[in-house]
């Protein structure tokens, strides 16, 4: 499952932000990295939910104050390297919590059509299918939510029910 770090940018773990006001969210792990190519800095937020479910999100630090920061495109044409960096951050989370399962949502941008799978989701899906084997994680997709779920098969007995429950939580949080 592991790849060389040369496939992504070096990253730094910054902080743990505890949540006490949310029914589902426990804490958020924050990482950062900087692109050697574009010199853009990125913030990665890994939200830890109940039952060891982690949502991986990232944005260009230049957009930190935008309410649409997760939807804005940086147009640096380095998606592959950024996604490998996300993959390595997921491995770091897995070292911290061996029971971790992951999910991410392909945020819509201005070129996406309502009701259709987002372009980001399609990119994430292709990347994950080619990078994460199904030995350790079972892959689930919810096209209607542009949601991709990786369920840790070693620690979750009923992976389909877990994925359905997680999709339900995501759906409630989105609306």
Predicted regions and their residues:
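Non-catalytic substrate-recognition and accessory regions of acyl/acetyltransferase enzymes
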Residues: 1-175
């Amino acid at each position: 499952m592991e790849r060389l770090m040369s496939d992504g940018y070096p990253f730094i773990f910054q902080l743990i932000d505890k949540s006490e006001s949310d029914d589902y969210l426990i804490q958020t792990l924050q990482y950062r990295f900087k692109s050697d190519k574009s010199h853009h800095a990125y913030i990665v937020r890994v939200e830890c939910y109940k039952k060891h479910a982690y949502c991986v999100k990232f944005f260009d630090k230049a957009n930190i104050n935008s309410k649409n920061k997760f939807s804005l495109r940086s147009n640096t044409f380095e998606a592959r390297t950024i996604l490998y960096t996300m993959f390595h951050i997921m491995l770091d989370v897995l070292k911290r919590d061996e029971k971790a399962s992951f999910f991410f949502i392909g945020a819509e941008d201005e070129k996406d059509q309502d009701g259709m799978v987002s372009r980001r989701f399609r990119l994430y899906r292709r990347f994950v299918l080619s990078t994460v084997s199904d030995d350790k994680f079972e892959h689930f997709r919810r096209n209607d939510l542009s949601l991709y779920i990786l369920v840790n098969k070693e620690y979750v007995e009923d992976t389909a029910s877990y994925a359905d429950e997680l999709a339900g939580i995501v759906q409630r949080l989105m609306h």
